[in-house]
Amino acid sequence: MKRATTLAVAGTLLLAALATPLPALAADPAPTLKPMLGVYLGRATVKDLDTQATEERDIDVEVTPFDRDGFRIRWVNVTLVDGRRNLPGVKRRVSELTFKPAKGRNFFVEVPQANVFAEREEVQPLGGDPVRWAVQDAAGLHVHSFVILGDGRYELQTYSRKRTDSGIVLHYERVVDGKLVRTIDGQAVKVE
């Protein structure tokens, strides 16, 4: 009789476990990230503060969930020639970064790109590898990249994206050894 009771209890627990809703296996980012998720298309102006040269870029930004509470950001920059993208000299650059929450902290850290054919290597900041992190706050989503340059100077890049009613406003700054050398400002609409 004890064996039958044990089996009955085990069966009941198994059924209860199967009937209990499980957390979604698909990505479910932190609630504060949800307004930022989406695909955005727009244009930005790049300004070199040393030369005062400017250039126009078409921008394509995609923010998607990663794992349970992280995010992936992918962006495409198309540097235009005379405001057009169908002329010789146009440049296209694609970048992608993935972030997950830092344990016990209120920011995100970069997740290294997976490569099944290579051994995982640790980030080497003194070897020139960038250290990247992201912060979500009331002003938007900010991605920071810090690099120690070969000559001992440093570079800090900050790319901020702020949600608007129709999309996002973008602002980028590149600082080398304390001096602001480049900015990018633009707007992008959310694609339905």
Q: Which residues are covered by each model-predicted region?
A:
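Bacterial N-terminal signal peptides that target proteins for export
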Residues: 1-11
